[in-house]
């Protein structure tokens, strides 16, 4: 079943709105989106809407395959990105990279 919305931690809101965060790494349960799909974006903590995004593509990627390029697309260093992934998805190796663009407000 396709996702009907997507949430991000509040700490990522500014990076998304400024266009410096252009991907999100998710587990399989949160990877069910398709190219071209438009999703409302809300904060995880309070479910407050703050923008809409359009999905560019979805690509499987293993934790061990993450590079500085992925980190830059997340607006982080690679060690920061690996720490965040370990915090959110402890022990998970298989991720899905969802590339997106923010739609005009």
Curated annotation (Swiss-Prot):
Its EC number is 3.5.1.135. The keyword Hydrolase applies. It comes from the Bacteria. Keywords: Hydrolase. The active site is at 21 (proton acceptor), 24 (nucleophile), 74 (proton donor). Transmembrane segments: none annotated. Pfam families: ASCH (PF04266). Residues 7-93 form the ASCH domain. GO terms for molecular function: hydrolase activity, acting on carbon-nitrogen (but not peptide) bonds, in linear amidines; N4-acetylcytidine amidohydrolase activity. This is N(4)-acetylcytidine amidohydrolase. It comes from Shewanella baltica (strain OS223).
